Amino acid sequence: MLKLRLKRSGRKKQPSYRLVVMENTTRRDGRPVEQVGYYNTITKESYFDVIKIKKWLNYGAKPTQTVLNLLKKAKIIDQ
């Protein structure tokens, strides 16, 4: 099953995350199917490719709870 997940990147103690589409059995830092955005926890900067996110949600990908909260905050989805 496909999931919209956060993949950690950045330096030690300075995390930033990439929003990616992955199989749910893949490791956190494994190879994604596609990258659809990023989120920097230090500067609170984020970018989400709305077209790609909606495409993968229509294909049946499920967002994790953290990703769901980020997408709601960015007003991409409203549930």
UniProtKB/Swiss-Prot annotation:
Gene Ontology terms: biological process: mitochondrial translation
Alphabetical keyword list: Chloroplast, Plastid, Ribonucleoprotein, Ribosomal protein
GO molecular function, one term: structural constituent of ribosome
Subcellular location: Plastid, Chloroplast
Main subcellular location: plastid
InterPro entries: Ribosomal_bS16, Ribosomal_bS16_CS, Ribosomal_bS16_dom_sf
Signal sequence range: none
A Gene Ontology cellular-component term: small ribosomal subunit
NCBIfam families reported for this sequence: S16 (TIGR00002)
Family to which the UniProt record says this protein belongs: Belongs to the bacterial ribosomal protein bS16 family.
Protein name: Small ribosomal subunit protein bS16c
Organism: Trieres chinensis (Marine centric diatom)
